[in-house]
Amino acid sequence: LGQAILRRHVEAFSHNGLPEDSDDARRYLAEHDDALAFARSNRALIARRILQQLKAEGEPRLDVAHNFVEPCTVAGEAGWLHRKGATPDGQGLVIIPGSRGDYSWLVKPVVSEASLFSLAHGAGRKWMRTECKDRLSAKFTPRQLCRTGMGSRVICRDRQLIYEEAPQAYKSIDSVVDCLADAGLITPVACLRPVLTLKTSGEKSA
């Protein structure tokens, strides 16, 4: 959905900006907000289905987007802040996830204008997606990658994706969290160990 919105916008306006009070800008922002609402509902549906399979009950505690644009004032200047793979620091506790073979961290953000009111949204990649299978296929079969060194399980029917998202392709989450803590941007609260990871491209199968 987001890609379709972007494609239509670029086809119409190239990469030029739009006056924020124009009809075109308002139309784009309305589509942007609709995409965020769709993503929110999709996450809720996934969570509900997981709870149903576990025959458990639960309620949402965290729901944080990390690809969106919003009005923001920095150093007294009003403008628009685009987060592309960044977590807002003003919504309370957030999770900074590691790879499927590493811990994730629950952290308390420290609101900071210097960091554009944003935090890292995960460990970050070491390798490009296109090189992961070449690096790993001689060492691991897809079946072997369905178990991690931490004992957690991975459900993924896409043979390309399971290599692209392998733990080896990501940085250590501890190094990222330590950097944020040393910079005074977060207070670590809890360390979370993965139990089950579901990965899907939504269109491919084994």
Question: Model regions: which residues?
Answer:
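Domain-length cofactor-binding catalytic modules of enzymes
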Residues: 1-206
